Amino acid sequence: FEAEREASFFTTGGLAAVHSSGRDRESIWAGLTRKETYGTSGDRILLWFDLVSDETILPMGTTTTLADNPRFRVKAVGAFEQKDGCPDYSSTNISQEELERICKNECYNPSDVRKNISRIEVVKITPQISNNENVDNLIKDTWKTFECKPSQQGCEIEFEDNEFAENSRDTIYY
């Protein structure tokens, strides 16, 4: 008798987040086209991961060519803590009984309080040069960890890859 409710949890697939200038379709598609996106299968955090080069800031999703060591700025803001139950508008198109049956009164119902970000972990991936190259040292998960002080405003850090110019290889960070 729980099959309908349980089925919604088996393949949730996570959430996609898009940096956009608005909530309209055109703004969201523009953010997707720029690849200013990230995914989360957990809390609904806010995340910025930017390359800081001279006076230029390139947002996540940007492809660029560099000869010097890259410098990054990462900011993460915690998800809203959830209030019990469902918001009032949840039952405008569905009866309270049906909402209780399907959701067991568990809805997205954010408070004004955000969870704290305890740390930021950065992963570094360097693609293979040849099929014979061992990938064990190319995927560094986790490459760098930065501890964060508790704050409702989130956590912001900057770091540099001091090996990039020396290694002179394509690299992906996230």
List where the protein language model places each region:
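C-terminal functional module detector
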Residues: 1-174
